[in-house]
Amino acid sequence: KLAPTNLDIRNTAGSALDQILIGNVYEGIVARDSKNQVAPAIASSWETSKDGLTYTFHLNKNMTFSNGDKLDAEDVAWSINELIAKGYHDADALAAVSKVEAKDADTAVITLKTPNSNLLWTLTGRAGLVFDKDAKYDLKTQAVGSGPYTVAKFVENSSITLKANEKYWGKNKAKTPTVVVKYLADDNAAVNALKSGDVQVLAPITENLAEPF
């Protein structure tokens, strides 16, 4: 279900890409914690000006993308500016943004036209994802992110294989070396796959389908 037809998270709608790529492969300037609150991610801390128009983000040091490229404030500024300029998915949620700049390698500044109390929350989703401004790859079939996993294999409408990112800069490194996410056509096929051991985890599953287990 919800099987993605491609990996282009900047242009393709649907929750499947959010679920599999955000936090695993791509990371945002901020994230959501287990309590669904805004939490540090690429930015370790931030502050807001008294007038609510300027957000200053202080980035973690020594960050890299999965291809080994350095991740800094230039990538942050480029990613958000590109999203707005090209009208990528969720660009409309950043309508209040005037500009995004790299103050220095470790500091990114977002300036607003009018205050937006939802800005940080918006940046926990697609709008805040940070991409490698120098990387050249096919976004529909490949992914270059800064998260704990990389995309090792993608089969359209079928499966995504994630592999632990050996270059991951963060503390919460991948604990499972390889994860294969399969998208099954219907509930019965999914339950049969779980019964046979073809899959180890099944989600979502209804109460009736869970009864045999």
Predicted regions, residues:
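Ligand-site clamp/hinge motif
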Residues: Y137, K167-P212
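Gly/Pro-rich hinge or "lid" segments in bacterial periplasmic/extracellular proteins
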Residues: L123-A174, T178
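N-terminal lobe/hinge region of extracytoplasmic solute-binding protein
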Residues: K1-K50, V144-G145
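Aromatic- and charge-enriched surface segment that lines or borders ligand/interaction sites
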Residues: S44-G87, K103, V109, A193-S196
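Short, solvent-exposed loop/turn elements at domain surfaces
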Residues: P4-N11, Q37-A39, N118-W121, S159-T161, ...
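Surface-exposed binding/hinge segments that line
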Residues: D92-K133, K153
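Short, well-ordered beta-strand elements
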Residues: K1-A3, T54-F57, V76-S79, A108-I110, ...
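Pocket-flanking alpha-helical
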Residues: L7-I9, R32, T64, G87-Y88, ...
